[in-house]
């Protein structure tokens, strides 16, 4: 409700604010965006998505692995000496080294679809971050205006107390001259007490609103926290029709963009699941060599002479995997349907908020006009009442 009220007020009034002292609305919003925990979490999620994009980008490159091993053996073994088979105790050791690589050639278009999905997920995460900033900005604007509203109410209540005291003093003087009854004096005195009680209540409301705002922007302590005294210029402007606002919001609202990116990404998610239906082709190669202490040759000669090379292709053809791939595709399609429903729901929610804000703005405009008329009438009534007791 507060959100709609803020949007409505902003739609009716073009407010030019010049800060005199304390925190301005812009400063409150900037501070909250920098320190709000939810926004910082959303920013980290966006960074994680960026890392995922980088990972998917280089998935087609070959991998390269090196390995080295050293082993020792002790025990009895059978050897042939001449025509005899004998068992002797021996100790030996061996060394091996290798370098291998593997290159994906065809993966059923899994790699390009994973890269496309990662980029869309990054865009969605960035849109989520913008939505978090929008939400905190609206909440702070609402709390900021509530502080100013309560502050103004308190000033009005203090003015009412002074006015009641003046009326009480005037009636008391008239009573001394016999021109006012004791009942009128008692009534004026009671009005002073009632207005003083109202002033205390409005002061409490102002302090609580200020505390809420300081907590919302993540201030460590509310001590010394105050708002800038704004110089406000109000200009009534024609309201933009809600349908026109809605069409503009569809292309700019972060929540809509995030839902659209996720729906688009679900198409690639289906293709990733379908890639398991296709054969997988890869190329591999390796280089290796080894040394055996049981061979009567030095280390360098053996490492050179035992050097081996290998290259080959590997083709994997899926035949039957207990319907796992089929069910993954079904799950991906259901997820796509959910993302489509989520987008529709986000659009409906946006249109509802715009309609509510538009009617709130219309009511605010009417209330402002009638309040101005009532204020002028009250001033005229006050002048007449003052003349009555003078």
Regions found by a protein language model. Name each.
Residues 1-25, 36:
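Bacterial Sec-dependent N-terminal signal peptides
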Residues 19-69, 75, 221, 227-264, ...:
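Bacterial Sec-pathway N-terminal export signals of envelope proteins
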Residues 20-143, 281, 285, 323-326:
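Short flexible linkers and secondary-structure junctions
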